[in-house]
Regions:
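Accessory, non-ATPase domains that flank or precede helicase/AAA+ motor cores in DNA-metabolism machines
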Residues: 2-331, 748
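N-terminal pre-P-loop "Q-motif" helix
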Residues: 341-357
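Hydrophobic anchor at the beta1->P-loop junction of P-loop NTPases
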Residues: 363, 391
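Walker A (P-loop) phosphate-binding loop of P-loop NTPases
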Residues: 368
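Conserved lysine of the Walker
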Residues: 371
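Conserved helicase motor core of SF1/SF2 NTP-dependent helicases
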Residues: 377, 381, 385-387, 393-405, ...
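Conserved helicase motor core of P-loop NTPases
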Residues: 471-619, 630, 737-738
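C-terminal accessory regions
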Residues: 625-748
């Protein structure tokens, strides 16, 4: 029974649940993440409204198109701003039955290449049977006047793809999966997507980025998979290991802890989880090593492989001779000093000598200690010998800074390895090594174990390799502690530079970074400086001052562009002073108007600064890359982002790979350097306040560092040098193997 829609109603009637029907006239708003939808609906003649009269329908549904018939359950309400509307608790959309509805439906953008004119011709030809013809007799499209073969094939393909997607969307709506995620599922599994997911929902966690255990588990329990199912137990084991890798950076977990955490997650008995673990071991999805009080070390197979292969790659390079005549280091250093017009410090000379005589060496130290000088010297000396020098860094910003400071071309490690989308692997690998004689890598503290594996697989055995980095910064975002493990192993020659060169009488950025690293108080001077501390006691005041400095005070005083030159850094994503809220508020202040594409609660506008959240090899864009929105299309909810001037298109389903980046976490800023940074440090961030976090933040600023927050929080961070050790075995793997002397000869 369909309820009438009265012109006025009492409060009591507004509270009653009713059912309304109609035809979608327009989709005013639709959020692909949570399904929130605002529709303009034409009421049918059976309603007490006049025929054709429209009303506003608000509720949650998945994909919806103009012309569809809609049925909704809910209540009539009066919104203070938008007036009378129907607030639905359930919305069901079905394909239209009337000729007018079908024509509007086809012209809504549902079918690629079909607009109003062509939709009219198709419906004129087939009438009320149009949708049946498209589904079951698409060959009859030849009967439509002036419709060529190519267009017919385009319509057929688009229609059948949408049928698959519509079935998937209905499934997604039932189990609370967003349109964007369902689109990715269909893209991954094809026309059998729903059947595949029903058979094993947990494969979603493994196959698709952005879909976690909670979503897969909800689907699994809803389709009848038992709570103590081996399928569920195995998924819990994998998810627990993946969570520890991605959130804590661990490469392995103790067996007892793993089973305990998986039990806490699922309430599955430990005995069943233990059996599931053994099955995962048999199928080589996980690997076990060693024994101890806490049980075996359990690795996800890819992380175990990454550690093993990285160690193997290092041994291969250390154990292989160079193909060129050995360099006389003393003469080479003297030659370079005469050319440069100054003498190196003793520790710099030591670092340079090691890098000229050892196959693989490491140079570490904080800001201003002369690391770049050594890179420049190495490049000059090796180039003078006619050798090919390759400079690379983990991120685009780090590579650009390396090129500018050294005066030679540099690239990202991903572009050095060159992803091949056809083979779905890097072009340069163990079978096809990179071309070059000397490979120098900067900002290596950012390199995680997976990237290290790919890198060392692709380096030629004869290569000379130099890693440069700062072990006192935060470790890599991804799992592992590669630079630290290399040094810890003692298998690779490492030199630590500690004398500060890059400072003058007025510069406090470098000085304060070293103060923090030594556990000492900050220096703050009145008057002109490159380092300031602004006290803000409560989070609201801290937010207000951040916006004030970002939008007016820094641009006015220092002439810096807030969009391109100033970066806000904060320890966390959540809370008032987390990146999510900061980006929302800073966007309102810096880029408040213009056409926008919506994803979840985020608006993307032309001019917005955005960051990529994952490696997307097909787009040649990588985790942490920063770009600017160049164009938006509200019609298909796509946008174009310029990364270093290169345009990259994002479809609606890809938008979850992007976030606004007016503010970013300190960890995400690693490897980048900005003309100015605003660092928020408050007791709201208490659990994150650590020395290496503050040190990393301060070393991101080149010309200006502005600290906003509470003195107690600053002191807490400086004094808290307790760093959680990452569970890795790379150092052990390097120590346990046959030792080499670093010059290409093995020692027994």
């Amino acid at each position: 029974m369909t309820a009438s829609v009265p012109e006025s109603a009492s409060a009591a009637s507004e509270a009653a649940t009713e059912t309304v029907e109609g035809t979608v006239q327009s989709v005013v708003y639709h959020n692909d993440e949570n399904g929130y939808t605002v529709l303009t609906v034409a009421a049918p003649a059976a309603f007490e409204l006049a025929k054709g009269r429209t009303f506003t329908l608000v509720g949650k549904t998945q994909a919806v198109w103009e012309g569809e018939d809609v049925t909704a359950e809910g209540q009539w309400v009066t919104d203070k701003v938008h007036g009378r509307q129907f607030k639905a608790t359930a919305i069901t959309c079905v394909a239209p039955k009337s000729v007018a509805g079908i024509e509007r439906y086809l012209a809504s953008g549902l079918i690629k290449g079909v607009g109003k004119v062509l939709a009219h011709r198709i419906v004129q030809t087939f009438g009320e049977r149009t949708l049946d013809v498209l589904s079951h007799q698409s060959g009859r499209l030849r009967e439509v006047p002036k419709l060529g073969r190519t267009k017919i094939e385009q319509i057929r393909a688009s229609w059948h793809a949408n049928e698959t997607l519509r079935d998937a969307m209905i499934f997604g709506q039932t189990y609370g999966i967003s349109v964007n995620k369902m689109t990715k599922i269909v893209r991954r599994y094809g026309p059998d997507a729903v059947a595949i997911v029903k058979a094993n929902p947990y494969r979603l966690c493994r196959d698709l980025w952005g879909i976690g255990f909670a979503t897969a588990d909800r689907i699994a329990l809803s389709v009848g998979i038992p709570k103590d199912s081996p399928l569920r137990a195995r998924a819990a084991i994998a998810y627990t290991l993946e969570t520890e890798a991605e959130e804590a950076g661990h490469c392995w977990s103790y067996e007892n802890n793993l089973l305990l955490h998986a039990h806490e997650l699922t309430e599955i008995p430990v005995e069943i989880l233990g059996e599931a673990l053994e099955q995962e071991l048999r199928e080589r999805r996980v690997v076990a090593e060693g024994t101890g009080e806490e049980g075996r070390r359990i690795y996800l197979y890819p992380l175990w492989l990454a550690e093993r292969d990285t160690a193997s790659g290092v041994r291969r390079i250390l154990g292989s001779p160079v193909p060129f005549r050995a360099i006389d280091a003393d003469k080479a250093v003297a030659w370079w000093e005469a050319r440069a017009g100054f003498h190196l410090a003793a520790r710099q000379r030591e670092a340079l000598t090691r890098s000229l005589t050892d196959k693989f060496s490491i140079i570490t130290g904080g800001p201003g200690v002369g690391k770049t000088t050594i890179i420049r010297a190495l490049a000059d000396i090796y180039s003078a010998r006619g050798l090919k020098i390759v400079l690379a860094a983990p991120t685009g910003r780090a590579a650009k800074r390396m090129a500018e400071s050294v005066g030679r071309p540099a690239q990202t490690i991903h572009r050095l390895l060159k992803w091949n989308p056809v083979t779905n692997r890097f072009t340069y690998n163990a079978e096809n090594p990179c071309e070059g004689d000397v490979f120098i890598f900067d900002e290596t503290s950012m390199i995680d174990i997976r990237l290290a594996r790919d890198l060392f697989a692709a380096l030629p055995s004869a290569a000379v390799v130099v890693w440069v980095g700062d072990t006192d910064q935060l470790p890599s975002v991804g799992p592992g502690c590669v630079l630290g493990d290399f040094i810890k192993s003692g298998a690779i020659a490492a030199t630590r530079l500690d004398h500060i060169f890059r400072q003058d009488t007025s510069g406090l950025i470098v000085r304060n970074a070293h103060h923090v690293n030594a556990g000492e108080p900050l220096e703050v001077r009145p008057g002109e400086s490159d380092f300031y501390f602004v006290r803000a006691e409560d989070p609201e005041q801290c937010l207000k001052r951040t916006i004030e400095f970002m939008t007016t005070r820094i641009p006015n005083k220092f002439g810096l562009d807030p969009l391109r030159d100033v970066q806000v850094l904060t320890p966390m994503r959540r809370n008032l002073l987390g990146t999510e809220n900061l980006n929302c508020e800073l966007q309102k202040a810096l880029n408040p108007t213009g056409d926008a594409v919506v994803r979840g609660g985020t608006l993307f506008r032309v001019g917005d600064r955005v960051m990529q959240l994952r490696n997307n090899y097909d787009k040649d864009v990588y985790n942490g890359d920063v770009g600017f929105v160049q164009a938006v299309s509200a019609a298909d909810r796509s946008l174009v982002v310029a990364f270093d001037g290169r345009p990259v298109k994002y479809e609606a389903a890809d938008l979850d790979e992007l976030v606004l980046s007016y503010a970013t976490t300190i960890h995400k800023s690693q490897g980048s350097e900005y003309p100015a940074v605003i660092v928020l440090i408050h007791t709201q961030h208490y659990v994150m306040l650590q020395r290496n976090l503050l040190y990393t933040a301060l070393t991101r600023g080149k010309k200006l560092v502005l600290l906003i927050g509470v003195p107690f929080a600053v002191d807490r961070a400086i004094q808290n040098n307790v760093v959680q050790e990452r569970r890795t075995s790379l150092a052990e793997r390097l120590v346990q193997t046959s030792r080499v002397d670093g010059k290409g000869t093995e020692t027994k």
